């Protein structure tokens, strides 16, 4: 963990292309959290992947009584597991694709023609494998040797995402859905952060019925997973309507990220959003705050 000035952070103009170098050696995470607890800090979480999103960091904060933004440890861990998250979303009435066992990979490819495989516990579309030909099955099997993969039939359609926001006054609502138009291929990590040709249209060009369904399903997923503060759920708009992909309990909040675009479309200033999330974080730990 490093202590970094606002000026240094703001001066890092290309965060997804150039690695940020904080300049000091930093201290261990546990020591930094002990320091935050002693100083009565509130943490605004902006980390991604691994222990930052799987509930481990959140549990470390909870054990120390440190207020933090976003979902708690149990919800974070549940949403980070794509298999479990799909199951809970389906219980809430959200359409989710069927999973495919690795042993049935060849038969599933013969039946569906196209498949998609992704790490069961990761974010930002890391590790996506599109199975469009038989030789792609080898890549899936090799990837599944080192970590668990979710394998599903490929669902054709428009990519969409929809945020949910909880406010300190008790109001909870869905933000305007965003339509994603990848410039080249699929909306993987490169398309999300590096390709200028990718379009993120907010509000999306959806029919009123599809927009309403996206907002309803995002809210259902948020509640089914017991998310806190804010979340963002990704979908594919198939011929049968929105199909659930995953829920992000710590969606990106950079200038290139989707959630701030939805806040802007809703007429919410980003600074006001952060201030309100800090109030919520304090209130969870200190109810009188």
Question: PLM features: what roles do these ranges have?
Answer:
Residues 1-69, 73-74, 78-80, 84, ...:
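ATP-binding N-terminal substructure of ATP-dependent carboxylate-amine bond-forming enzymes
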Residues 4, 67-68, 96, 115, ...:
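Hydrophobic beta-strand scaffold residues
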Residues 33-38, 76-157, 168-169, 212:
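Active-site nucleotide/adenylate-binding loops and adjacent lid/helix of ATP-dependent enzymes
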Residues 59-62, 187-194, 249:
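Short, flexible, mixed-charge acidic loops at enzyme active sites
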Residues 59-68, 133-138, 266-267:
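A glycine- and small-aliphatic-rich helix-loop capping segment at beta-alpha/alpha-beta transitions
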Residues 132-216, 237, 242-243:
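Phosphate-binding site of ATP-dependent enzymes
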Residues 207-289:
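ATP-dependent carboxylate activation and anion-phosphoryl transfer catalytic cores
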């Amino acid at each position: 963990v490093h202590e970094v000035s606002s000026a240094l952070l703001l001066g890092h103009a290309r965060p997804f292309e150039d690695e940020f170098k904080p300049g000091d050696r930093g201290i261990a995470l546990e020591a930094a959290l002990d320091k935050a607890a002693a100083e009565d800090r509130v943490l605004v979480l902006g980390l991604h992947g691994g222990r930052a999103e799987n509930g481990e960091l959140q549990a470390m904060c909870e054990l120390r009584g440190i207020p933090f933004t976003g979902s708690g440890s149990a919800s974070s861990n549940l949403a980070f597991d794509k298999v479990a998250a799909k199951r809970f979303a389906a219980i809430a009435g959200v359409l989710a694709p069927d999973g495919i066992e690795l042993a049935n990979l060849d038969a599933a490819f013969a039946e569906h023609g196209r498949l998609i495989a992704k790490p069961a516990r990761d974010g930002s579309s890391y590790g996506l494998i599109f199975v469009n030909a038989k030789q792609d099955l080898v890549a899936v099997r090799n990837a599944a040797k080192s970590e668990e993969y979710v394998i599903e039939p490929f669902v054709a359609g428009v990519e969409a995402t929809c945020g949910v926001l909880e406010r300190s006054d008790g109001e909870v609502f869905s933000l305007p859905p965003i339509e994603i138009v990848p410039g080249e291929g699929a909306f993987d990590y490169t398309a999300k952060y590096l390709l200028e040709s990718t379009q993120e249209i907010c509000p999306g060009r959806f029919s009123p019925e599809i927009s309403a369904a996206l907002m309803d399903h995002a809210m259902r997923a948020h509640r089914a997973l017991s998310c806190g503060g804010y979340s963002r759920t990704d979908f594919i708009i198939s011929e049968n309507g929105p199909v659930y992909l995953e829920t992000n309990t710590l969606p990106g909040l950079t200038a290139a990220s989707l959630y701030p675009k939805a806040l802007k479309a809703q007429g919410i200033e980003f600074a006001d959003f952060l201030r309100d999330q800090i109030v919520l974080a304090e209130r969870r730990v200190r109810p009188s705050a």
